[in-house]
Amino acid sequence: MGVTKKPDLNDPVLRAKLAKGMGHNYYGEPAWPNDLLYIFPVVILGTIACNVGLAVLEPSMIGEPADPFATPLEILPEWYFFPVFQILRTVPNKLLGVLLMVSVPTGLLTVPFLENVNKFQNPFRRPVATTVFLIGTAVALWLGIGATLPIEKSLTLGLF
């Protein structure tokens, strides 16, 4: 290894190179050819191999044939719609239920404006956002679990 001297920022040649945009920090490995030719194909082929392996080892079984004349007792949506379904099911006025559904993303959009400390990403330094997240998660779980129960026990989850 040779001896490297510290760059002199008063050197006109170096200042001209820096003015042109040269002198950026080049840390790590270049993306071409290391990532694009070697790492990405390995990841893509590994993902394909996992999918094929799961399809061969655990094929999805075909269930019983659909009967268009037999309706289930209670029709439930997919699991990720359970909280919204519970809101629509328990609120007597459907317009109010739709307004409650619209208020959720609207409320989430207002959280950054409530707490004007955007320079902090640590959740312990953003108590309002952390509290809104925790309460929202608890309410979503409560509504989601309640949607799987009969309407009489849905809000109390059968606990009270």
Curated annotation (Swiss-Prot):
Gene3D superfamilies in alphabetical order: plastocyanin oxidoreductase, Single helix bin
Localization terms from the record: Plastid, Chloroplast thylakoid membrane
Segments crossing the lipid bilayer: 36-56, 95-115, 131-151
UniProt keyword Membrane present: yes
Cysteine disulfide partners in this protein: none
InterPro entries attached to this UniProt entry: Cyt_b/b6_C (IPR005798), Cyt_b/b6_C_sf (IPR036150), Cyt_b6/f_cplx_suIV (IPR005870), Cytochrome_b_C_euk/bac (IPR048260)
Pfam families xref list: Cytochrom_B_C
Record-level GO cellular component terms: chloroplast thylakoid membrane; plastid
Membrane topology recorded in Swiss-Prot or TrEMBL: Multi-pass membrane protein
Keyword Aminoacyl-tRNA synthetase attributed: no
Family, per entry: Belongs to the cytochrome b family. PetD subfamily.
Oligomer status and interactors: The 4 large subunits of the cytochrome b6-f complex are cytochrome b6, subunit IV (17 kDa polypeptide, petD), cytochrome f and the Rieske protein, while the 4 small subunits are petG, petL, petM and petN. The complex functions as a dimer.
Designated name of the protein: Cytochrome b6-f complex subunit 4
Natural source organism: Oryza sativa subsp. japonica (Rice)
